[in-house]
Amino acid sequence: MPRLSHHDLRRNFRELLNADRCFHTASVFDPMSARIAADLGFEVGILGGSVASLQVLAAPDFNLITLSEFVEQATRICRVAQLPVLADADHGYGNALNVMRTVSELERAGISALTIEDTLLPPKFGRRSTDLIGMFEAVGKIRAALEARVDPEMAIIGRTNAGVIGFEEVIARAQAYEKAGADAICLVGIEDFDHLESIASQLSKPLMLVTYGNPNLRDNARLAALGVRIVVNGHAAYFAAIKATYDCLREQRQVDALDLNASQLSVKYSTADEYVVWAEEYMQVKE
């Protein structure tokens, strides 16, 4: 079977955005997982920033991974992937000029689409980890991303957090990102269908939701009717891999180790608790 080019895969992603149903992403974190996802029939894979940090650095999601490290992992994945890969590009690794570099590098890696979020990253001294940058700065990042894009088929998605700001600000930000030219809007923190409908009714671009498996948002037909095209349920495949590795090695060693679940394992082996203490001690950052 002939291989699809990166341009072909980007065009396929565009077709998904223009379809009349929603698609659930597969968490792809290395070349093997990308091949498995495509073979099982997933239409889209996602390389999450948190998963990339764990996979590359064994570090928690504290914006420790560099653009170069993230791009290297994306390149490995896209070298073999025969499904569109969506990159969680966090805040674009800096200001609007850094966003341009991020888009250029990820496009060259073969990514089909990427999200640029308006979270204040990395967290600043004395600020909450969920604080957002100003709307005008965020719009500048979207415009810069579009300027840096060479292949017009690659989708630029503006992301905001509906769980930490009020309804009117969510609408204002999403509409501003649409006006700036974003190909879709990614929403985090949607609570239920009433919450989603109140926002979706004010927007015109396709929507992407990060739900983390929220049981209140599991009706695919209703999601599609509200304009949702991409759903990210989380990264269960990655955490299942961590759990399987731990269980296999524990059995092989025949040691009396604790039977930890995937979440406990990721916290333990990424030394996440240390980073929380350091952030509070040296930066006065609170979760």
From Swiss-Prot:
It holds the Pfam family PEP_mutase. Belongs to the isocitrate lyase/PEP mutase superfamily. Oxaloacetate decarboxylase family. Substrate binds at S50, R159, H235. This is Oxaloacetate decarboxylase. CDD domains: ICL_PEPM. Transmembrane segments: none annotated. Keywords: Decarboxylase, Lyase, Magnesium, Metal-binding. GO terms for molecular function: magnesium ion binding; methylisocitrate lyase activity; oxaloacetate decarboxylase activity. One of its GO terms (biological process) is propionate catabolic process, 2-methylcitrate cycle. Homotetramer; dimer of dimers. Binds 1 Mg(2+) ion per subunit. Its cofactor is Mg(2+). InterPro entries: ICL/PEPM (IPR039556), Oxaloacetate_deCOase_bac (IPR023687), Pyrv/PenolPyrv_kinase-like_dom (IPR015813), Pyrv_kinase-like_dom_sf (IPR040442). It comes from the Bacteria. Its EC number is 4.1.1.112. Mg(2+) binds at D88. HAMAP family: OadC. Gene3D superfamilies: Phosphoenolpyruvate-binding domains (3.20.20.60).
